[in-house]
Amino acid sequence: MLHRSHEPTSNTPYDMVCVIHLRAAKTFSFNTAFLKTAHLFQSVVQQVAVQLQYICFMRYIQVTIKDIARELGISPSTVSRALKDHPDISPETKKAVNALAEKLNYQPNIVALSLRQSKTNTIGVIIPEIVHFFFSTVISGIEDVAYSAGYNVILAQSNESLQREKTDIKALFNSRVDGMLMSISRETTNFDHIEAILSKGVPIVFFDRVHNSPQSSKVIVDDFEGAKEATLHLIEQGCKRIAHLEGPPNLVISKQRLEGYKTALNQHKMPIHPELIVSCPSGTIEEGKEATEKLMALKNPPDGIFSTNDPAAMGAMQAIKEKGLKIPKDIAVAGFSNWFFSSLMDPPLTTVDQPGFEMGQEAARLLIRHIEMKDKDNAELTSETKILKTRLIVRASSLKKK
């Protein structure tokens, strides 16, 4: 029988395993050979544990060039040149260095590299909502250009919150991004947080929802012309009282679309009725539905609706159907943005198409050009504004005349 004095008291994993085996021996009568076997087992477990600890340490602790050099018995400069495939380093040394680097999961220290080069080859992107179909197409365009040019992309979303936007822009700045692409939230009316970053020399290119700063470039669509064309189409279809579901009043895109709507009415000498302009600050389906219910409750309801976006237009169509009215016979509807569901609605929604992918590409090209100009000595940055054309897609929701 084994005595308690023979049991290890340590709480390490390998000692605990041995305790289990040693205690098991108390239940049975084993000879001295078992005791020797148990202690041998403990020794093996100790060795395995040490190896596991080393592997875990090397896996989760940042491996450096010095670690590789120490293991191979060569200088850190030789390791550095081998990793860069320098011609002065022998193929055998390169092979050994790269094999060990892969085994130890070596990754270059991006922070140290960026401090030496004053560049991270990283672009920060801030959007209001990633679930927004238009913004998802913009992101695709940004990544298409950025990755081709050797830049990584860090994406942040404000969720339409000014406070989140402030947090995001600060986090991207602290991450030492080379520049930022940004579309402001609907809550953003004060731009001090943006001006603070611009004053530090970080290039920012705005897209879609923009801040009119002389220090920054922007890529937008012609919201005015797109809205005017959609409203003119409703007029051509015979609409006499056209309502407008207005977007967030602080956003330039909302103002431009409202002006396009008004200009189309003025061109046809049609009066602008304030009661036919209803605010939808969030631009949601629910807001569009509620706004349309109010419009249909008017003594003289509209026979056409131009919505600031497609979700609100979808809500308008729901309200019209629930009222027992026909689209477009009783009320014609047109939206803006050409969301993916627009063509699937019943009837399919007439809408203004925004080239989101192209906008993302142009914004990324502009920013990369600014970054590279900034890297050149005495290069003076000049702000640019790129305006992309919209396209009216006519579908059944607005075709009163067939």
Where are the predicted features?
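N-terminal helix-turn-helix/winged-helix DNA-binding helices
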Residues: 58-64, 102-140, 148-151, 159-160, ...
